[in-house]
A protein has these predicted regions:
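Low-complexity, disordered terminal segments
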Residues: 1-7
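Non-catalytic, mobile gating and regulatory segments of ester bond hydrolases
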Residues: 9-267, 271-482
Length: 482
């Protein structure tokens, strides 16, 4: 599919040759040496032969453009990005009319690396200071294993409770009461109910998708109003998913809560995190459990699922949402994809011709004044789109947000960098910042990042554990990590 995607959009990219076909045909036809050679070769229709040669050259130029873009994108974002681009193309097809994709001259594929040039100039998300609550950090490190546990273990099939236990790891006092890991997808994700007597909690763990491309495709969906909550919008598919999980686990939850008197802890990763957030909302204000137990939610890599954040139904909920570095899923919503598409279309409309390819080929390093001007045109075009979005939202795509208190895990390289530290992995140093969901309302294409690695549950665990070790080493002082 990604090959088809590149071919479709890159076919238009060869327009940078202008009227190459016509020009080459004319050159062949007007060259006496070619005419003489054609006669010797027995070519009767010289114009047809010249035209065929022009088409061949044009085709090869198009293939070279495709390979250039693929090489550039792979170097910038890692090989996994092709699956991500495939998913993004599917997402943009959902809103092709609004984006006017048919009017694209070069295609979105050609624009993405250039849009990424501007994204690389942006500052990191605005934060509200470091996470200094050591007890809460301890809990996040602990509960991320339960989010991972919802995936189970591939080598233990047919024994869901045992699979969850092994995936969670050795944790005393944990008893899995119910588990259904065989269901997958956004309709009814895998899930389990457990009692943790050590932490004194009943746990509802919800599984996410196993691939980044699936997570992106499923995360980008329509919004719908939540019943009994006028004005509160939620991701339509994940809201249905949350209702299905509650229906399948209500009995086990009620029984475990009644037996123990413990509060309820809901957790998940990726789409499982989005579903966990919506389960928290539904069980709080729409269809509460008996006795209305105290509830908390730990969401790792959640997509935007609710809005507006000022709605009364969201007040009083205890939701902790974690975003790892440049993970795209917490930034993936229909509104955000639409605005990324607008940025691509703005770049596509620029009359840059061969400058766009030279900039891609040379890592956006202009070699002359013309290329410098071309780069600035690109930066200005994308910035203008971002400024327009800041003024108002598109009425067809209401914004959804990651709910609760947001924590951003930054892997420290240079100050404020989202790039990998170019040292041994054991020396990578994470920090965790408190932030607001509004700071993640853009689907960014950051160079030097790995979309898949940033999204994996293991990456979240590594970041949280690394920051915990740092706080312990410095006696709770967050300090600036150099």
């Amino acid at each position: 599919a990604i090959g088809h995607f590149f071919y479709l959009h890159s076919a238009m990219a060869t327009n940078w040759l202008g009227s190459a076909h016509e020009q080459v045909t004319t050159a062949y036809a007007q060259a006496p040496s070619f005419q003489k050679m054609a006669t010797q070769m027995g070519i009767i229709d010289f114009h047809q032969w010249a035209s065929a040669k022009a088409i061949d050259l044009h085709s090869r130029a198009g293939q070279q453009v495709v390979e250039l873009v693929k090489t550039k994108v792979k170097a910038e974002f890692g090989s996994e990005v092709f699956g991500m681009l495939d998913a993004l193309s599917e997402c943009m097809e959902k809103i092709s009319k609004e984006l006017k994709l048919k009017e694209a001259k070069f295609g979105l594929t050609m624009a993405l690396p250039l849009v990424g040039m501007q994204h690389n100039t942006l500052k990191p998300p605005a934060t509200e200071g470091p996470m200094t609550d050591a007890a809460l950090l301890d809990e996040a490190v602990y509960w991320v294993d339960f989010a991972q546990g919802a995936y189970g273990k591939d080598d233990i099939k047919g024994y869901d409770k045992a699979s969850v236990n092994v995936a969670i790891g050795e944790k005393p006092g944990v008893e899995v009461k119910a588990a259904n890991l065989q269901t997958t997808g956004v309709q009814l994700p895998g899930h389990f109910v457990a009692v943790d007597r050590t932490m004194k909690a009943v746990v509802l763990g919800i599984r996410g998708t196993t691939t980044l491309s699936d997570a992106l495709t499923d995360a980008v969906g329509e919004a719908t109003e939540v019943e009994k909550c006028p004005g509160l919008l939620a991701h339509k598919a994940m809201l249905a998913s949350a209702k299905a999980v509650i229906e399948n686990t209500r009995s086990a939850l009620e029984q475990a809560l009644k037996e123990t008197g413990f509060p309820l802890l809901i957790t998940g990763h990726s789409l499982g995190a989005g579903t966990a957030i919506l389960c928290t909302v539904l069980l709080s204000v729409v269809s509460p459990l008996s006795g209305r137990p105290r509830m908390r939610c730990f969401a790792f890599a959640p997509p935007p699922v609710v809005g507006p954040l000022t709605h009364n139904a969201l007040r009083g909920l205890t939701i902790h949402s974690f975003i790892n570095r440049a993970d795209v899923v917490p930034r993936a919503s229909l509104a955000n994809v639409f605005h990324l598409g607008l940025e691509c279309m703005a770049v596509d409309r620029l009359d840059l011709y061969h400058h766009r390819f030279n900039l891609m080929r040379r890592d956006a390093a202009p070699e002359n004044e013309e290329e410098t001007k071309a780069k600035q045109l690109i930066l200005d075009a994308v910035q203008e789109c971002q400024d327009e979005r800041a003024k108002k939202h598109h009425e067809s795509f209401p914004p959804l947000f990651v709910a609760g208190q947001v924590y951003w895990i930054e892997w420290q390289g240079q100050v404020g960098s989202v790039e990998d530290v170019k040292t041994d992995s054991s020396e990578r140093k994470p920090r965790v910042h408190m932030a607001k969901a509004e700071a993640f309302q853009a689907l960014l294409l950051r160079g030097g990042t790995n979309a898949l690695k940033d999204h994996m549950c293991g990456g979240y665990k590594e970041g949280l554990e690394g920051y915990k070790a740092h706080l312990q080493a410095f006696g709770g002082c967050h300090c600036v990590i150099n």
